[in-house]
Swiss-Prot record:
Involved in protein export. Acts as a chaperone by maintaining the newly synthesized protein in an open conformation. Functions as a peptidyl-prolyl cis-trans isomerase. It is found in: Cytoplasm. GO terms for biological process: 'de novo' cotranslational protein folding; cell division; chaperone-mediated protein folding; protein transport; protein unfolding. It comes from the Bacteria. Consists of 3 domains; the N-terminus binds the ribosome, the middle domain has PPIase activity, while the C-terminus has intrinsic chaperone activity on its own. It catalyses: [protein]-peptidylproline (omega=180) = [protein]-peptidylproline (omega=0). Gene3D superfamilies: 3.10.50.40, Trigger factor ribosome-binding domain, Trigger factor, C-terminal domain. The gene is tig. The lineage of its organism: Bacteria, Pseudomonadati, Campylobacterota, Epsilonproteobacteria, Campylobacterales. It comes from Campylobacter fetus subsp. fetus (strain 82-40). This is Trigger factor.
Length: 435
């Protein structure tokens, strides 16, 4: 088997060979001989099974194993020809051609390697920003929110239901005139405007009077968890029994202890300072996500140019396409299923964004290495568990779900990115005058 290989650029190489039928058959025969020594077939002693019997029973499996072995041989021989090591490879080689004719196989592969990333001078592209300011009014509003949060619910006498009120009501949902499982409850308590129910439901209850009944028309989101309801129109029959609300209490000693349970003798000044820092942190996070990160990303991909592994770019294109799939109409989905050329053309629209995303990922990875930024397994576990608690789901099941979907590396990368950007943008702060 003669292998030809050449570097396409610093991150990709092409390999080509033709495997003769005799070479493939020899591989299969050799594997069958090895298997015959250990395999057990009724009527034959262990180690005495004829090769012909092994081939008869396991021939197809052995042929697949032989092809896999040839595939590995091609990769290894290619690495020698282009002076690369197996540790340089990133991802799986892409099979561009695998044509079988008269027992011979014409194979073309593309092998990708970890890119050579240099980020010298990254300090020059860190955007400047001013420390977010926090006003007295913002602190007072936040304290008022906390006071309302811990206040008990009370029945409210008012004309009709408004945003922010708590509604005690009965409901039953129908799709195509039929009630569906899980779509009924009595005496249910819901904060109007909280977004707990499907879009349109809470808005449809606005203006409802105590004792009044109403049909609320909604449409389940296309990505709704229950597949049999996803995208369906529904009617919910609701009856309002009571309107409840919360009144902000006083900021007394007892309330301060509730709001700051870890402080021995909490004071209003301590609470204000803590809230001020939290508001500032929230504002900075917003600034980071909406302004600083995008600016840095645009400048980074423009400044740091390097060859990208094609297989990783292709994976990113596929991922972006899959993410967008749910946004297509039924007609569009049907068209893509039936028209391969239209599917290919649509997939190509994600290429530029995918290239930018992959490029930025490698830049972030290199910067994180230079700055010694890591995320431990314990930190990753805590983050996944915390997310589970926020959504009220079992943390162990949530972790297992992430493992099955292969999402843990992506979560870890996102955490490294967050640490990195918080570290980077410290040096971009040109003004720190507080209020």
């Amino acid at each position: 088997m003669e292998v030809k290989a050449k570097l396409l650029n610093t991150a990709n190489a092409a390999a080509q060979t033709e495997v003769k039928a005799s070479e493939l058959n020899a591989k299969v025969e050799n594997l069958a001989k090895k298997a015959a020594k250990n395999i057990k077939i009724d009527g034959f002693r262990k180690g005495k099974v004829p090769v012909a019997q092994v081939l008869k029973r396991y021939g197809k499996d052995l042929e697949n194993d032989a092809k896999s072995e040839i595939f590995r041989d091609i990769v290894n021989e290619s690495l020698k020809l282009i002076a690369k090591k197996s540790s340089d490879i990133i991802g799986e080689p892409m099979i561009l051609k695998f044509d079988e004719k008269d027992g011979n196989i014409d194979i073309e592969l593309e092998i990708s390697f970890k890119p050579e990333v240099k980020v010298d001078g990254y300090e020059e592209i860190i955007p400047e920003y001013t420390t977010p300011k926090v006003t007295k009014k913002e602190i007072e509003e936040k304290i008022n929110e906390f006071l309302k949060m811990i206040a008990p619910l009370e029945k409210v006498e008012k004309e009709s239901l408004e945003k922010g009120d708590f509604a005690k009501f009965d409901f039953e949902g129908f799709v195509d005139g039929e009630a569906f499982e899980g779509g009924k409850a009595e005496g249910y308590l819901l904060e109007i405007g909280s977004g707990q129910f499907i879009p349109g439901f809470e808005d449809g209850m606005l203006g409802l009077k105590v004792g009044e009944q109403k049909d609320v028309n909604v449409t389940f989101p296309a990505e709704y968890g229950a597949a049999h309801l996803a995208g369906k129109s529904a009617v919910f029959k609701v009856k309002l029994h009571e309107i409840q609300g919360k009144k902000a209490g006083k900021l007394d000693e007892e309330t301060l202890k509730k709001l700051m349970p870890n402080e021995e003798n909490p004071t209003a000044e301590q609470l204000e300072d803590r809230i001020k820092e939290q508001i500032r942190a929230d504002k900075f996070q917003k600034l980071l996500n909406e302004d600083l990160k995008p600016k840095f990303a645009d400048k980074a991909v423009e400044k740091f140019k390097f060859d990208l592994p094609n297989n990783i770019v292709e994976q990113e294109i596929d991922m972006q396409f899959r993410s967008a799939w749910g946004n297509f109409s039924e007609d569009e989905m049907k068209k893509f299923r039936e028209d391969k050329e239209a599917l290919k053309k649509q997939r190509e629209t994600y290429k530029n964004e995918a290239i930018k995303s992959v490029q930025l990922t490698f830049i972030i990875d290199e910067l994180a290495k230079q700055k010694g930024i890591t995320v431990s397994d314990n930190e990753l576990l805590q983050a996944v568990y915390f997310e589970a608690y926020r959504y009220g789901i079992d943390p162990k099941e949530h972790l297992e779900s992430y493992k099955k979907q292969g999402m843990l590396p992506a979560v870890k990368m996102a955490m490294i990115e967050e640490k990195l950007f918080n570290n980077l943008f410290k040096s971009g702060n040109r003004e720190d005058k507080g209020e």
